[in-house]
Amino acid sequence: MFVKAILLLSIAVAYASADCLHCICMRESGCKPIGCHMDVGSLSCGYYQIKIPYYEDCGQPGKKHGESTEVAWKRCADDLKCATNCVENYYNRYKHECAGTGQGACEVMARNHNGGPRGCHASGTLGYWKGVHSCCGCS
């Protein structure tokens, strides 16, 4: 019975995470591969409007041997699977910065995605979070 409860909880968490990611994607690009655009003085690219330092922080998923970081970043950002992997990696790298805030996983993911490693502490990310929350109802 305990194993069954853990399995059901894991499935529920996976769905909540997928809903949260989808809503972040919708907020950033309508969940479309929109290429790169200037945003606050630097390029943001793809489904999640990822900037190059964010791509570096998420571990540069999908980067091929001998490929420049810039080429890999732009390609990854316009590939939904790769870009989603980057956002998940970024969340996992920086979620500890938000321990003790009482924020749920989706709020931490959304606010850090929008505001950087300590975005969960920045009041400027609240509007972004409210938009994501209204999409999925996630916490």
Swiss-Prot record:
S-S bridge residues: 20-106, 23-138, 25-31, 36-45, 58-86, 76-82, 98-120
Q: Which InterPro entries match?
A: Invert_lysozyme, Lysozyme-like_dom_sf
Can you tell which superkingdom this protein's organism belongs to?
Eukaryota
Q: Name one Pfam family in it.
A: Destabilase
Query: Which keywords appear in this protein's UniProt record, sorted alphabetically?
Result: Antibiotic, Antimicrobial, Bacteriolytic enzyme, Disulfide bond, Glycosidase, Hydrolase, Signal
Q: What induces it?
A: Induced by Gram-positive bacterium M.nematophilum CBX102 infection but not by Gram-negative bacterium P.aeruginosa PAO1 infection. Induced by Gram-positive bacterium S.aureus infection.
Q: Which GO terms describe its molecular function?
A: lysozyme activity
Q: Does the record's keyword annotation contain Hydrolase?
A: yes
The enzyme's E.C. designation = 3.2.1.17
- Binding sites annotated in the UniProt record for substrate: 51-57, 90, 113-115
Matching Gene3D superfamilies = 1.10.530.10
Gene disruption: observed consequences:
Simultaneous RNAi-mediated knockdown of lys-5 results in a reduction in survival following S.aureus infection.
Question: What is this enzyme's catalytic activity, as reactions?
Answer: Hydrolysis of (1->4)-beta-linkages between N-acetylmuramic acid and N-acetyl-D-glucosamine residues in a peptidoglycan and between N-acetyl-D-glucosamine residues in chitodextrins
- Name all I-type lysozyme domain ranges: 19-138
Catalytic site:
28 (proton donor), 39 (nucleophile)
- Family the UniProt entry places it in: Belongs to the glycosyl hydrolase 22 family. Type-I lysozyme subfamily.
User: This protein is called what?
Assistant: Invertebrate-type lysozyme 2
Instruction: Supply the source organism for this entry.
Output: Caenorhabditis elegans
